[in-house]
């Protein structure tokens, strides 16, 4: 089963956009993510609708951040991309009248609800600014010299 990496990928994109400090085209983002610019525009539209990014058309156009990273929580991005399923597992519905299935579903459902609440609370507590700080600490630890990377590419 393939995992849904949209959240991680969009967090990655937003951090690069902050570093780049210029409009980033859908084509640039698509190249970074090895996907189609149409997919990028569709995903970025959710972020735009929530007021985290804006898009400018034209020769020097592209996507830019509207808010500072410190004001965007991971939960904000998760919600803006459509709140993808957190778990691939879930209750069964083959035999809803079966008391065994009901007991199993009750236990699994309760556990998943508790786990989801913990995950969402953590996503709410962490900002993109926190992630940027973690990146900068990791970069400094390398002892690297020269400019920091702006946009990933193949």
Can you name each region flagged by the protein language model?
Residues 50-66:
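Beta-hairpin "wing" of winged helix-turn-helix
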Residues 69-94, 112-113:
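Conserved segment of winged-helix/HTH DNA-binding domains
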Residues 1-33:
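Extreme N-terminal segment that seeds HTH/winged-HTH DNA-binding domains in transcriptional regulators
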Residues 96-154:
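C-terminal regulatory/oligomerization modules of transcriptional regulators
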């Amino acid at each position: 089963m393939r995992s849904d990496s949209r959240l991680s990928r969009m967090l990655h994109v937003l951090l690069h956009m902050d570093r780049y400090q210029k409009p980033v085209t859908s084509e640039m983002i698509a190249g970074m993510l090895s996907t189609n610019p149409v997919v990028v525009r569709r995903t970025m539209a959710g972020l735009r609708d929530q007021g985290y990014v804006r898009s400018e058309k034209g020769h020097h156009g592209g996507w830019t951040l509207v808010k500072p990273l410190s004001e965007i929580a991971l939960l904000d991005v998760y919600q803006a991309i459509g709140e993808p399923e957190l778990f691939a597992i879930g209750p069964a519905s083959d035999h809803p009248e079966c008391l065994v299935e009901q007991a199993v579903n009750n236990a699994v459902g309760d556990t998943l609800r508790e786990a989801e609440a913990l995950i969402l609370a953590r996503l709410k507590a962490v900002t993109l600014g926190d992630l940027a700080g973690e990146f900068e600490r990791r970069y400094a630890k390398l002892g690297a010299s020269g400019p920091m990377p702006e946009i990933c590419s193949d």
